[in-house]
């Protein structure tokens, strides 16, 4: 049985909620505190498989989701705008889109600060010097300050995959080997 692709729906929902949260935080001068709460909640999601499953699960009722989110927020010390935001999201049964909301909020906040975000995939962890060199190179290309999020994926074998906005630069060894393999098939 094929599964429906809800990524576009999730993305639209996430962007609308993130935009509303950012506008409210900006009006109240609370962008930094909301960003800190977002980072804290994202860390909790990354550390807890149970929380990740709870957020993604459609099984729980809106009332159960709301009670759980209130308890989690209180225990984690999350209050103010972000705690109220989480309550609205739970009440509207949109917790499944929360990871996308966090990502969208970060992008909106970075754009507001005149920064852009780059997603970097590397075969191994980058040193601080390599990250700095990459930021400088990307700033030269984009003309804006760049924040990078590095993901380690050993399957790319070597090199980097850099995504900035809608552009992607793939210098991974895996891609180069795939290209070479295709070229050899065409020749022989």
UniProtKB/Swiss-Prot annotation:
Domain of life: Bacteria
Gene Ontology cellular component annotations, sorted alphabetically: plasma membrane; proton-transporting ATP synthase complex
One of the record's GO molecular function terms: proton-transporting ATP synthase activity, rotational mechanism
Chain segments annotated as transmembrane: none
InterPro entries for the chain: ATP_synth_OSCP/delta_N_sf (IPR026015), ATPase_OSCP/d_CS (IPR020781), ATPase_OSCP/dsu (IPR000711)
Predominant location category: membrane
Membrane topology: Peripheral membrane protein
Compartment(s): Cell inner membrane
Keywords: ATP synthesis, Cell inner membrane, Cell membrane, CF(1), Hydrogen ion transport, Ion transport, Membrane, Transport
UniProt family annotation: Belongs to the ATPase delta chain family.
Biological role: F(1)F(0) ATP synthase produces ATP from ADP in the presence of a proton or sodium gradient. F-type ATPases consist of two structural domains, F(1) containing the extramembraneous catalytic core and F(0) containing the membrane proton channel, linked together by a central stalk and a peripheral stalk. During catalysis, ATP synthesis in the catalytic domain of F(1) is coupled via a rotary mechanism of the central stalk subunits to proton translocation.
Record-linked HAMAP family: ATP_synth_delta_bact
The protein's assembly and partners: F-type ATPases have 2 components, F(1) - the catalytic core - and F(0) - the membrane proton channel. F(1) has five subunits: alpha(3), beta(3), gamma(1), delta(1), epsilon(1). F(0) has three main subunits: a(1), b(2) and c(10-14). The alpha and beta chains form an alternating ring which encloses part of the gamma chain. F(1) is attached to F(0) by a central stalk formed by the gamma and epsilon chains, while a peripheral stalk is formed by the delta and b chains.
Protein name: ATP synthase subunit delta
Organism encoding this protein: Rhizobium johnstonii (strain DSM 114642 / LMG 32736 / 3841) (Rhizobium leguminosarum bv. viciae)
């Amino acid at each position: 049985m094929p599964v429906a692709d809800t990524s576009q729906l999730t993305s639209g929902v996430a962007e609308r909620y993130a935009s509303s949260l950012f506008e409210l935080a900006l009006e109240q001068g609370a962008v930094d505190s909301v960003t800190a709460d977002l980072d804290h909640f994202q860390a909790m999601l990354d550390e807890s498989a149970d929380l990740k499953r709870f957020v993604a699960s459609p099984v729980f009722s809106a009332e159960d989701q709301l009670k759980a989110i209130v308890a989690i927020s209180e225990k984690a010390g999350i209050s103010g705008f972000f705690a109220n935001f989480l309550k609205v999201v739970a009440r509207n049964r949109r917790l499944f889109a929360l990871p996308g909301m966090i990502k969208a909020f970060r992008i909106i906040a970075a754009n507001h600060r005149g920064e852009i975000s780059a997603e970097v995939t590397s075969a191994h962890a980058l040193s601080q010097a390599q990250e700095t060199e990459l930021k400088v190179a990307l700033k030269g290309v984009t003309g804006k300050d760049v924040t990078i999020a590095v993901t380690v994926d050993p399957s790319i074998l070597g090199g980097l995959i850099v995504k900035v906005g809608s552009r992607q630069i793939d210098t991974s060894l895996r891609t180069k080997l795939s290209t070479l393999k295709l070229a050899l098939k065409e020749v022989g």
